[in-house]
């Protein structure tokens, strides 16, 4: 009888863990919220039910305050999801619970009238270039990492999560967030980096000015002036008084941290994928040299020829061909790698 009672209790407990009411958005994702004193962290799981136990795949999205879902005035709601709609979601869901965290101080669902042309959330539709002030103050690397760690702590307590594996990956700015998560969380088993800049962020501006001068799009005099202005902007980012007056500099300061130093400290399998026509990731070609110098063999890299930052093909005139996308191929190769 005691054994029967224990079994019934266990079954009841499991039923509660899997059967509680869910906040399902657009029949695509389940929303979760973690309330804190000064912030509420919203995140979504790309599914509508939790009847399978699977490992977590946390995808860290790129920059800018884009909502996870857009609500048009007349048409149906649709998902941005931090860019995951470019992926083969069914392939990912076969193996993992796919998680995406909302940008800080950014609603999960936003009416289309509160988006600018880049699909960024703007509180005032008459000021398309003005982001929410709270978002600007929260837009720094350490905050993104701290929020993600809270989400991972929550997920570790869920009965529908398989803890044998934890995949963390990010694209562009998200690769920086993913790096810090993996650096500080020993539960992470695989790290994926897409369109990453191994030397941070601000160096890209300087390299851009040089390339423009080399292509004679601007003079070397102009490039010199722009580079010097970039140095000054970065100095300002490290001046506390200037930083208080212009909180936008906080993002430049935190995200310009070189990643390659962190990567060399990470011992878990690391996957680096980038397009050869991506100026942000230009210097990824140097990364294997650092691993060789440090006798490290945990890096797998994939160089995608003639693709740009978001893995689209490039036309002969250098413009992006949005009809020829390769994100599904890129992500599926990564998923295959995580299963080896």
Where does each model-flagged region fall?
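Conserved alpha/beta-hydrolase "acid-adjacent" motif
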Residues: 279-286
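Short, surface-exposed "cap/lid" segments of acyl-processing enzymes
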Residues: 50-95, 100, 106-112
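Short beta-strand/loop motif that positions the catalytic acidic residue
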Residues: 266, 272-274
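Primarily recognizes the serine-hydrolase "nucleophile elbow" in alpha/beta-hydrolase
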Residues: 151-210
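Accessory cap/linker subdomain of secreted extracellular hydrolases
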Residues: 119-134, 141, 192-264
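N-terminal cap/lid segment of alpha/beta-hydrolase-fold proteins
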Residues: 20-55
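Catalytic active-site module of serine/aspartate enzymes centered on a nucleophile-bearing elbow/loop
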Residues: 307-340
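Alpha/beta-hydrolase active-site loop
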Residues: 112-158
């Amino acid at each position: 009888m005691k054994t029967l009672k224990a079994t019934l209790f266990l079954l009841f407990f499991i039923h509660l863990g899997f059967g509680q009411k869910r906040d399902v958005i657009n029949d695509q994702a389940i929303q979760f919220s973690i309330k804190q004193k000064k912030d509420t962290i919203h995140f979504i799981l790309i599914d509508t039910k939790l009847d399978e136990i699977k490992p977590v795949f946390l995808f860290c999205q790129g920059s800018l305050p884009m909502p996870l879902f857009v609500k048009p005035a007349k048409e149906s709601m649709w998902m941005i999801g931090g860019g995951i709609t470019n992926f083969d979601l069914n392939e990912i869901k076969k193996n993992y619970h796919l998680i995406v965290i909302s940008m800080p101080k950014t609603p999960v669902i936003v009416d289309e009238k509160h988006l600018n042309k880049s699909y960024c959330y703007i509180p005032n539709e008459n000021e398309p270039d003005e982001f929410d002030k709270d978002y600007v103050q929260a837009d720094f690397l350490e905050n993104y990492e701290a929020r993600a760690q809270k989400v991972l702590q929550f997920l570790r307590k869920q009965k529908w999560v398989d803890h044998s594996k934890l995949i963390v990956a990010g694209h562009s700015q998200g690769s920086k967030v993913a790096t810090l998560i993996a650096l500080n969380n020993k539960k992470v088993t695989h790290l994926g980096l897409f369109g990453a800049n191994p030397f941070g962020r601000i160096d890209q501006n300087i390299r851009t000015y040089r390339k423009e001068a080399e292509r004679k799009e601007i003079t070397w005099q102009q490039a010199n002036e722009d580079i010097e202005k970039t140095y000054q902007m970065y100095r300002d980012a490290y001046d506390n008084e200037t930083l208080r007056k212009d909180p936008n500099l906080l993002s430049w300061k935190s995200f310009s941290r070189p990643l390659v130093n962190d990567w060399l400290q990470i011992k878990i399998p690391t996957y680096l994928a980038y397009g050869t026509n991506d100026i942000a990731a230009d210097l990824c070609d140097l990364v294997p040299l650092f691993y060789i110098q440090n006798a490290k063999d945990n890096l797998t890299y994939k160089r995608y020829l003639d693709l740009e930052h978001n893995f689209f093909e490039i036309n002969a005139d250098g413009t992006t061909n949005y009809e020829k996308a390769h994100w599904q191929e890129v992500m599926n190769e990564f998923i295959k790698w995580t299963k080896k």
